[in-house]
């Protein structure tokens, strides 16, 4: 993968897309070989990556901002400013005090994305970021991803909703049974 490019990871259910993202993010170990991010082992590059799981990894008993504060500690971030900015970028009010357990699925999905981007990662790994979000939120997320790509962030995204990304992503990678079987330019991608 090249820096600053937007890749869509495709394949049928069970092809290994989510597993590959989890391996890159350091959550699963590869059965053989190693994963390098910017020339260093992936587990040493965790501070350069943002990861959004298909099922939001959040604490239901905390507010949205409290969730982000918890994860910000892992990155040595003590200021609320980048956390509030990330929440606003995904269309959530950082002052909302409601517990995440009371959020809709779409709000949880957007908060999970805010958790993945508040530290401005160089590599963003997203597993189905458009699931459970309404059409307006999906467009807002697509615009956010376009802005991040323009700022040099490399994006690797798993989705079955290709239409939304046809003019945004640069390239698709097709997996089958855990193997890369095809790759190519996305329809509408600029060369």
Regions found by a protein language model. Give the residues of each.
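Conserved ABC ATPase "signature" region
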Residues: 69, 80-95
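H-loop/switch region of ABC-family ATPase nucleotide-binding domains
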Residues: 159-160
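Conserved ABC transporter NBD signature motif
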Residues: 33-45
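Catalytic Walker B motif of ABC-type/P-loop ATPase nucleotide-binding domains
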Residues: 124-127
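Helix-to-loop junction immediately C-terminal to a conserved catalytic motif
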Residues: 25
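The feature captures the beta-strand-to-loop junction immediately N-terminal to the Walker
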Residues: 10-12
